[in-house]
Amino acid sequence: MKIYKKSILVCSCTLAIFTLAACGTNQNQTMEKQDKTTIQQDKTDKVNYTGTYSNLNSKESVEDVRKALAAHLDKDSVDTFFNLVNDYNATVGSVGLTGDFSTFTKTEYDVEKITNLWTPKKGDFVGTNCRINSYCLLKNSIEIPNVEKDDSLLFLDNDAIDKGKVFGAEDKDAFDILFSRVKTEATTDVKVHAAKMEQFLSQFKFNENARMLSVVVHDDLDGQSLFIGHVGILVPSEDGYLFVEKLTFEEPYQAIKFATKEDCYKYLDTKYENYTGEGLAKPFIMDNDKWVQS
């Protein structure tokens, strides 16, 4: 098992020290509202999911994904997101990024080559990660309460936001609240941690159609806490569901088409299941404010 320290945890969905960091519904239909009880994931065939993916490195894939996102999110947010996508791909897109959707298998990216293309053009702005991009998409369609924040694990995110002038002070404050560290107990029991995360996220009003799927990790370096180490947005599409994510600061955007939302849960669950350590609970998935049991 991989034992992560604070620097590794914070970099989930960031500087490649830690790779965590990071059907059948019509596009015009709304995604069914989740029950108020915990979401159950089918325990059979856990790793059996299929999909197609794109790094949004073609006009056709961008138009396809834009259409799916625009059906459930405001134009300004979608435009802001694609400005970030286009800037990233224009800078590093020559490093084998896919355009048209193709069969989704395990993806690996040459971070060294990407960095060598990015840094000379962008300097000390490291780019954006999963949390920044997810917030850009959701910020106008969710309600974030004015509650106390703990942004101690967001210093890399906030530095990138400032240096890249991604958004202003008000949005930055809301971002820090949404992705705050959450206090928890010293236990490996995921149920305990999931209840803490559900309680915290219940304060927010989420978009029922553009859903925030989060991978929550447990950390014990500076007290017992929970942190959204990876996050992306799931929307209904013409062929099922579309999941949009930015893997890390260096690694690219991925738009993945799944037949069912359960397939997306399985993708996240299996991709990040080993990011834990001795005495720590395994990562778990949240769909908006509900725990997805695996």
Give the ranges of each region predicted by the language model:
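Bacterial N-terminal signal peptides that target proteins for export
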Residues: 1-11
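Repetitive helical segments and hydrophobic/amphipathic motifs
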Residues: 14-15
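C-terminal motif of bacterial Sec signal peptides marking the signal peptidase cleavage site
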Residues: 18-22
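Cysteine-nucleophile amide-bond enzymes
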Residues: 23-294
